[in-house]
Swiss-Prot record:
Component of the PAN1 actin cytoskeleton-regulatory complex. Residues 1452-1469 form the WH2 domain. The gene is pan1. Residues 174-262, 465-554 form the EH domain. It comes from Aspergillus clavatus (strain ATCC 1007 / CBS 513.65 / DSM 816 / NCTC 3887 / NRRL 1 / QM 1276 / 107). This is Actin cytoskeleton-regulatory complex protein pan1.
Length: 1485
């Protein structure tokens, strides 16, 4: 294809080294030329014919077998070679019909002969029924005379070989099972037929319709047989249907590609089943091929040693027969022997599996007298006549019905199939095309194993190959660029499966110019080299001439020609000295070597490129006469187109020329005028359009300015966006801190809940093993803790025995407490995880919201283009002056309209303004006086003003509350630009509004006066009977009397004067009435203003009084707190002294305890101890614990004093509540509330030296858990600071058993209340317990008046530190304690020393629980009076608490006496005197 001759298409006349030229082929004989050839007894050796053992499957369109050669007999014939003996030609009748197997190349022609051959039987040219075919082994055996050795048996097949390729749609185990089942069913075959497949598929018990669909989908080759991948696909589809899934209407692309690829691999990999040819003396017809082994390897055609199916397919190329060993695909047949008078005619040979347009071309076989165009119909050298012994009566004829040849699949059915088999003589070329075509799914599952082979492929690219490669190129060159880039080429060539080194070498050969891309011809070269490599040929080191593309070869030839011409020209000019002469125009050194083939070329009429010279004369126009003269040429004429000089023109001609020129100039002027008029008209039209557009823009701008929402246009400015972005960033930075704080609080809550459960569990199960308090690292229970717990348990049991109580049963095993703790821990952990998930969700939502806000900021941001447009059309930058003036005019109009609109919206009637000030709800607002912010929030104000006013009110409210609390409001020292602009804008608007209100008032007054003056003449008749008529003026009365007396003299003058006087009087009266009305109106307005100011002043005074009252109360509270602190410090010192004394006593008692313990352990008879136990052991009376002495809720503390004040205004109420909040917060919220500490500091700064207040404190009610759980205090005792809270003076001890009070064991209570000093030691608790048990009743019962000297462990109110968060009092207890007594009045500023001040308990370290809501009817603050009467008995305590104690009263004896004098009743107390037996324990033994 690429060669200019006919030797590059695989023809027979390939002019290659090592081969003789045409008509000079060597003789094809067993003997060399010149030697006699003896008669041979054997025929041709057995030739491989493909699948000779397969049954014939011929249809009517195939060639029927015909008898060729010498039928019926074997007679010696002489071939007529000069100088050689006659050669015995033995041709046995062969059945040359086409089988479905690839035929071995046979030699059907003979060289020229000079002796006639006798033909005894003509060959049948019809299409008779074909007899049974014979295999190649039978053909080989027919040449033996019977004396030879029998052919060896065919080799045993190795069985069906399934490629080790993994199918992706089934598992590896299923594939192994299917392979085993397939091999057991097919044996040595490669396919399973329909019957066996049906038997296997029917085992699935699927309906026939489903199996039919499965067969249709599985039989991809449509051959009625299944390869293994098809069988595996069928089993896979059966499995799909069995599991209930529907069958797909068509196979997915990936599965189809995998199955088809594996079928191709199996099809191309089927080995030959024929045996090796038998060793005999049959001449070797491959000898001529072996003679060219010494030839250069580049153009020679390598021959495979063991021909296979792939080789045979690649060898089926049309060849001229009779010269070199040709490959025709037929058995050795001598066709066209039609009789003695008929010579050998050309017959159609080749391969039946190809179409007639490709390879089915006439071939000269045998003798011919004229050259016959066979095999290749292209131009070729003429062939000389070949005498063959026959006459010239040979005529071409086709035998065997060549017209009925159609493409048929070769091989046995199902081996390649009707789909996967290639349709050309080159094997695997179609598979390679399908592999390399761009198609979906090519990335997955394609294998390249089926593309390799060992076929015989020529160097030259055939037409069919070129067509396939061109189709591939066009398919990949989707944009029709004419080339394929390196990336695409890598993708295409990488699908071939070759290694990278081979592909690099192929690319280097295909891209000789190193352009990095391949055109169509270079791509074909690369594909051909890949195809050769896949078939076992090495990649050449340099590109052979047959593979050089025509475009490259022609271009290289052209470049070489030009280079040679240039070099020859340079040499000739150098030799002749022409390069020293000036260049002469029109001289070409390439006249005989033109690119167009010389002067005789068809394009001789056109000037060649080598002869081109610009013709300056052809250019019309003026040329100066002073132009440079070239050489010796004469001076050219001045006008280039003028052939006559100007002197030769006559005057008339010159005048005519002038007139013509004038006419032309006039015409040009006329055209210019017309063009100017047109331009002017266009300019006028453009101006009109521009003016109309400007008017339209103005109207639209006016509409925008007058729109109600026009105010919101200026809100979205850059400064506000930046401010909002900074705020957003600040909030976003606070999110992690808040989240970590939330997690910390959750962790603390979980730990607190777990600790609370431990305490409750210890209370519910006193004898449980969980009572062991670990003193090891991290709270771990050590062995010393267990020893101490066991000793404590023994002491409790012994104490119970001594007291006569039953021994506490330890029914709770060691694992129950752990299980309960674990279950509670699980619940707490689940709650914590749930809260953690909620926290994460909140964080994620906050992040998403932040991102959305940031995106909105970014979307609203200006890009460079938008900013440029805005600066151009809004700031008038880079535009013309007219447009700039227009833009400035629009901006001025917009500002004016904006100000006018704001003025209109802010103009409010004065009456509405006054009503707004008279509104009591407005007067009770938190703001001290109506300011600009409250006015700006009118309904007519803009959204921006309303937002600013609301923000101002909120800030002012917060500032007032903080000022009332004694705090300095936190204000940002640096005022932002937006805030400053808003403030200035509000001030300006307020000034404008006030000025407009005054103008409106004056205008209304002026209009009213004008209206009254206009109604003047008609008004007297209506106003005389109604209004208060002033007395008539004296001149009028005198005038009347005079006129009556002188009526006759001057009637007309008097009448005229009277009329004028009456008119003047009427005008004066009306003016006086108007003045009176104006005066009254002004007075009313002045009174209204005075009233408004008075109301504002009263409201201000009320607020000031409330604030002063709050400050005074704060001072009182501060004094009380200071007094309580001092008292607590004093009591703490006393307690320390008492504790020191008790420790000394305990030290003295430890020795006694040790002795008694030894005695108790040594006793054998314990009955005596039981007799004395109830009398001697009284631990409950001697050591009252926290569970026995409980605080009682104080009736006076039910309502705190800030809520007793009358609600002056919502602001006062809110302020009071804000000040009362610190005193009503629970201890849990005390650490979180900054106002409490700051309020205390501010009140402390404001307090002067207050008058003394009675030292009376009333304990605040505590919850049952706080007051009755000793374990809580036990766990927190080390961190608690000693504080003092005076117990109630009327508190009584209970003399009953502790089981009747709160079900707490005496030993447990004693242990828990007295184990906080020396519980660090393992045995310390035991000594203390024993001492408290044995010596608790030595001293006589203490009087009630000395109850205030108890230690903190025996006080009615447990001492708590701010680190211990006490729960808030429930609403039920609050509601029970609230109505206990009428709320006491607030203390007066100078409280008397005699009156006991009743204030709620206020611990500086812990805040009390929040107070209940204020009663609905609270009396106003009266002057100081007598002390409040005692309240009723306290309400019952909440469930789970101990018996309530008596209400707390005064802290000393005088307070107790005062309470008794007021009628306080005391409960009768029975004293159980055990002094006789409490002095010492008995020593037994």
């Amino acid at each position: 294809m690429y060669s200019s001759s006919n030797s590059f298409m695989g023809g027979a006349n390939s002019a290659r080294p090592g081969q003789p030229p045409f008509m000079q082929q060597p003789s094809y004989s067993q003997y060399p030329p010149g030697q006699p050839q003896s008669q041979q007894q054997t025929g041709f050796p057995s030739q491989p014919t493909g699948y000779g053992l397969q049954p014939p499957q011929l249809v009517g369109s195939q060639l029927q077998p015909q008898q060729t050669g010498f039928p019926g007999q074997l007679q010696p014939q002489f071939t007529g070679f000069p100088g050689a003996a006659p050669q015995q030609q033995q041709q046995q009748q062969q059945l040359g019909g086409f089988q479905q197997s690839v035929q071995q190349p046979q030699f059907t022609g003979y060289p020229p002969q000079n002796q006639l051959l006798s033909l005894q039987a003509p060959s049948t040219t019809g299409l008779p029924t074909r007899p049974a075919p014979r295999t190649s082994s039978e053909v080989a055996s027919s040449f033996n005379d019977g004396a030879g050795v029998a052919p060896p048996p065919p080799p045993k097949s190795a069985g069906s070989k399934i490629p080790s390729i993994r199918l992706s749609f089934i598992t590896a185990q299923d594939q192994a099972k299917f392979e085993q089942l397939f091999k057991s069913a097919v044996g040595d075959s490669q396919t399973i037929d329909g019957g066996k497949a049906k038997e296997l598929l029917l085992r699935s018990r699927l309906p026939g319709s489903e199996l039919s669909k499965i067969w249709i989908l599985s039989d991809t080759t449509k051959s009625g047989q299944l390869f293994f991948p098809e069988f595996a696909l069928a089993m896979y589809l059966c499995n799909l249907r069995i599991t209930g899934r529907e069958l797909p209407p068509s196979l997915p692309e990936k599965i189809k590609n995998e199955v088809s690829s594996m079928v191709d691999i199996i099809s191309f990999g089927v080995p030959d089943t024929q045996p090796e040819p038998s060793r005999s003396n049959v001449p070797s017809f491959d000898a001529p091929l072996l003679e060219n082994k010494s030839a250069p390897p580049a153009p020679q055609q390598p021959q495979p040693q063991q021909p296979t199916n792939a080789h045979l397919l690649s060898q089926l190329a049309a060849q001229p027969t009779g010269f070199l060993p040709q490959q025709t695909g037929f058995q050795p047949n001598q066709s066209s022997f039609l009789g003695p008078s008929a010579g050998l005619a050309p017959q159609a040979t080749g391969f039946p599996g190809q179409s007639q347009q490709q390879y089915l071309q006439t071939q000269p076989t045998g003798l011919m007298t004229n050259p016959q165009a066979t095999g290749y119909s292209g131009p070729r050298p003429p062939l000389p006549p070949m005498p063959t012994g026959f006459g010239s009566n040979l005529s071409p004829a086709q035998t065997g019905g060549a017209s009925a040849l159609v493409a048929q699949p070769t091989g046995i059915p199902g081996q390649w199939g009707f789909v996967n088999a290639p349709s050309s003589g080159l094997p695997n070329i179609e598979a390679l095309k399908q592999q390399l075509m761009p198609q979906p799914g090519r990335e997955g599952g394609f294998t390249t194993a089926g593309l390799s082979g060992n076929a015989s492929i020529p160097w030259a690219i055939t037409k069919e190959e070129k067509k396939i490669y061109d189709d591939l190129f066009r398919a990949w060159d989707g944009f029709h660029k004419g080339f394929i880039g390196g990336d695409t080429a890598i993708e295409i060539m990488g699908q071939s499966g070759l290694n990278r080194q081979d592909l690099e070498r192929i690319w280097t050969l295909a891209d000789p110019h190193n352009r990095g891309r391949l055109n169509m011809d270079e791509f074909a070269v690369a594909m051909h080299l890949i195809y050769r490599k896949l078939n076992g040929y090495p990649v050449p080191s340099r590109l052979p001439p047959e593979l050089i593309p025509p475009s490259t070869r022609n271009l290289n030839d052209s470049i070489g020609t030009v280079k040679s011409l240039l070099s020859q020209d340079a040499e000739s000019r150098k030799a002749s000295g022409a390069f020293l002469q000036p260049q002469k125009t029109g001289v070409s050194y390439l006249k005989e070597h033109s690119f167009r083939g010389g002067a005789r070329s068809p394009g001789v009429g056109r000037k060649d490129a080598t002869l081109f010279k610009n013709n300056d004369e052809a250019a019309a126009g003026y040329r100066s006469s002073a132009r440079r003269r070239v050489g010796n040429n004469a001076r050219a004429a001045s006008p280039a187109t003028s052939h006559t000089s100007e002197e030769e023109l006559s005057v008339e001609q010159l005048k005519k020329k002038i007139r013509e020129t004038q006419i032309m100039l006039d015409a040009v002027d006329f055209q210019d005028e017309n063009r100017a008029e047109e331009d002017e008209a266009l300019d006028r039209r453009d101006r009109r359009e521009a003016e109309s557009l400007m008017d339209r823009v103005r109207r639209i701008q006016d509409d925008i300015d007058t729109h109600p929402n026009a105010t919101f246009r200026n809100l979205d400015n850059g400064a506000e966006k930046r401010s909002l972005r900074r705020q957003l960033q600040a909030y976003e930075d606070q999110v992690p801190q808040v989240a970590s704080e939330v997690r910390r609080i959750e962790r603390e809550l979980a730990e607190a809940k777990l600790e609370l459960f431990r305490l409750k569990d210890a209370k519910a199960h006193p004898n449980s093993a969980s009572n062991i308090v670990g003193t090891g690292p991290g709270g771990a229970v050590t062995e010393a803790d267990r020893i101490k717990a066991r000793a404590r348990a023994r002491m409790q049991a012994r104490a119970a025995e001594l007291a006569g109580r039953p021994v506490p049963a330890s029914a709770d095993d060691d694992g129950a407490a752990a299980r309960r703790l674990e279950s509670e821990s699980t619940v707490i952990r689940a709650d914590r995880e749930r809260n953690e998930a909620m926290t994460r969700d909140v964080e994620e939502s906050v992040r998403e919201f932040t991102r959305s806000l940031e995106d909105s900021f970014k979307e609203g941001g200006e890009t460079s283009t938008r900013e440029h447009e805005r600066r151009r059309w809004e700031d008038a930058l880079g535009v013309e002056d007219v447009i700039r003036d227009f833009i400035y005019d629009l901006k001025r109009g917009s500002r004016t309209a904006h100000v006018r609109k704001e003025e209109e919206t802010r103009t409010l009637p004065t009456h509405d303004h006054r009503v707004r000030h008279e509104d009591p709800s407005i007067a009770s607002r938190p703001s001290p006086a109506p300011s600009a912010g409250s006015v700006g929030s009118a309904p007519g104000a803009t959204h921006e003003d309303r937002v600013a006013a609301a923000r101002e009110r909120a800030q002012r409210r917060i500032a007032e509350r903080m000022a009332a609390a004694g705090l300095k409001p936190h204000t940002d020292s640096t005022e932002t630009l937006v805030q400053r602009q808003e403030r200035e804008k509000r001030e300006r608007e307020e000034r404008l509004r006030r000025a407009e209100e005054e103008d409106a008032k004056r205008e209304q007054e002026r209009q009213r006066r004008l209206a009254e003056e206009q109604r003047g003449p008609a008004k007297p008749a209506a106003t005389k009977p109604v209004g208060k008529k002033p007395p008539p003026a004296p001149p009028s009365r005198r005038g009347r009397t005079d006129s009556a007396g002188q009526a006759d003299a001057r009637p007309a003058v008097e009448e005229t004067a009277a009329t004028e006087q009456a008119a003047r009087e009427q005008a004066i009266r009306e003016e006086q009435q108007a003045q009176e009305e104006e005066t009254k109106r002004l007075e009313m307005e002045a009174q209204q203003r005075e009233q408004e100011l008075l109301k504002e002043k009263e409201a201000q005074e009320a607020r000031l009084r409330a604030l002063e009252e709050q400050v005074r109360q704060g001072k009182v509270r501060k004094q009380e707190e200071k007094r309580r602190k001092e008292e607590a410090e004093r009591s703490a010192k006393e307690q320390e002294a008492k504790l020191a004394a008790q420790r000394a006593e305990l030290e003295m008692a430890r020795e006694r305890e040790r002795q008694l313990q030894l005695e108790l352990e040594g006793l054998e008879d314990e009955s005596s101890s039981d007799e004395e136990g109830p009398v001697n052991i009284t631990p409950q009376d001697s050591t009252p614990t926290q569970s026995q002495v409980l605080p009682a809720p104080s009736p006076a503390a039910a309502a705190p004093e800030p809520e007793l004040e009358p609600p002056v205004s919502p602001e006062i109420t809110s302020s009071a509540s804000s000040h009362a909040a610190p005193s009503s917060f629970s201890p849990e919220t005390e650490s979180k509330n900054p106002y409490f500490r700051i309020t205390s500091q501010a009140a402390e700064n404001q307090v002067s030296s207050p008058p003394p207040v009675p030292q009376t404190t009333i304990t605040s009610p505590k919850t049952d858990v706080q007051s009755t759980n000793p374990f809580h205090r036990l766990a927190q005792q080390e961190a608690a600071k000693p504080a003092f809270t005076a117990p109630g003076p009327l508190e009584r001890k209970s003399r009953v058993r502790p089981e009747a009070d709160d079900d707490w064991s005496a030993a447990g209570s004693d242990f828990d209340s007295s184990d906080d000093e020396d519980d660090e030691r393992p045995g310390g608790g035991s000594a203390k317990q024993l001492a408290s048990i044995l010596f608790g009743t030595m001293a006589p019962p203490r009087p009630l008046s000395a109850m205030d000297d108890k230690s903190p462990s025996k006080s009615s109110t447990p001492v708590q530190d701010n680190t211990v968060a006490s729960p808030v009092v429930p609403e039920a207890s609050a509601s029970l304690s609230a109505p206990a007594a009428p709320p006491p009045p607030p203390p007066p500023p100078p409280p008397p020393a005699s009156a006991p001040m009743v204030v709620p308990s206020y611990d500086p370290s812990t805040a009390p629980p929040p107070p209940p809501p204020a009663p609905p009817i609270a009396p106003p603050a009266p002057p100081p009076g007598p002390p409040p009467p005692p309240g009723p008995p306290p309400p019952p305590a909440p469930p789970g608490a101990a018996a309530p104690a008596a209400p707390a009263g005064a802290a000393d004896r005088s307070a107790l006496l005062a309470s008794i004098q007021m009628g306080k009743g005391l409960r009768k107390v029975q004293t159980n005197d055990r002094s006789s037996s409490s002095s010492a324990g008995r020593v037994l033994g």
